[in-house]
Amino acid sequence: NLKDLLIEPDTAFIKKLKAGETDKKMGIELSIPTFRLAGLNLYKAITDNKINISKILFKDATCKLLMGKKPKKIVKHNDDKEFNIDSIYMKGLDGISIGKIEFLRNKFEIYDLVNDQLIVNNKDLKFELKDFFLEELKGNNDYFRLHLENLKLELLKEEFMVPGGNYNLNFERIYFSMADSILEIDGLLLKTTYNDKYELAKKLKFTSEIYDIAVEKIKISAFDLEGMIKNGIYIIDSVAVKGLHLDILMDKRLPFNTDKRPKLPNQSLKQMRSPLYISKISIEDSHLKYQEKYEGYEEPMTAILADLNAQIHFATSVKDSISTGKSMTVNLQSNFMEKPPLHVNFIFPLDSRADTFYFEGHLASAKMNEFNKASEPAIGVKFIKGDLKEIKFSGSANPEISKGSMTMLYSGLEAEVDKKNTEKDKNIFLCWVANTVVHASNPGKNNKL
């Protein structure tokens, strides 16, 4: 047992780190009240130079990363060489084997010295690392290879504050097995720290997405961890997401940030710095609610994709894969506004300079008034009567231009127009226009579209 271990930078270093006068990126403060080695065979360690430990325990430890002002120049020291798991230098040993490393009631924090605030922290970090060892390289004394083939990691119930302080991240369980090549995340929850989302919107300078995310289970299968560590290439066979509930709110009473332009999915992939290849992403039994708040309307515009299922194939930023000419595809099925079935297919060519993507879809029959939660706040139109028979649509788009066509079959349409920024007489006139000029049915009496 080792009690009350404390490692901390001195005040002079912290002062320089805060002012950006040091060549280091960060400082580390480490407090370990209890550090325990169990099952250590001292006789074997002395006679054979081999260390076998059944368990290492870190209890009530706190690791704090101290972030200062970005230094003008970062000097790379000889002892800052990149970590290579195939060639680890340790003099005087013939091998190390560790059964389990357990972290119990630990804390991890990132602290901003410049702004004097906590950026990231957690409540009670608990996890285990199992089954890994160091083996001496043959013919190369004092150099070892870290064997991770049977490594297992399990983290239970944890909560983190996300940088910025606007969100908390929770999960019930994270499990990783090197041998099975799987990573599982259960009970993931990302929620705002505000009870009222509009209170968070008041802090924002521009209109931006405010999220609430809950996921029952994420399973990542058949990935090359060694390739990720050594070469920074992320190759994954499949990602399965089950029970995703995604709520997005945008307060459109705030101005747009005209300096920021969101990228299309195919653009984002091609411009990724790290090579990524995912063969398949599947989303099952999920729910998406998108809302926009407008001036003058009490209720936000609401669009819902219920019972959402989606399949994404060939998501890659690897240049060799892109050069094959194969496209990323997205197939989506859901119940729009929780009622009529909606099917949409996307094709995202990756080997294209224009970044044009293509889509086509179909919406089944519904009562027109089922769309009022979207149409009334967005365009001031409330459907009184009418039956939608179907909508078919297709098109293409890129960052510069979009084009397409839509055919909408309906009957018995009757609507009211209520524009909040117009006078009552204008609204009466607009209602007359809507119900007189607009066709009540399509096809009409002449049976033409």
Language-model segments: what does each one mean?
Residues 1-4, 42-44, 49, 53, ...:
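Elongated, acidic membrane-bridging lipid-handling scaffolds
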Residues 6-9, 60-62, 107, 189-192, ...:
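Transmembrane beta-strands of outer-membrane beta-barrel pores
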Residues 14-38, 50-53, 116-130, 161-173, ...:
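Amphipathic hydrophobic-ligand
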Residues 42-47, 109-111, 225-230, 289-291, ...:
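Short beta-strands and strand-coil junctions in structured, solvent-facing domains, enriched
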Residues 65-67, 197, 248-250, 415-417:
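Outer-membrane beta-barrel proteins
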Residues 71-78, 202, 254-261, 378-379, ...:
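Flexible, surface-exposed loop regions and adjacent strand-edge segments
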Residues 345-350, 355, 362, 373-449:
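Extended terminal
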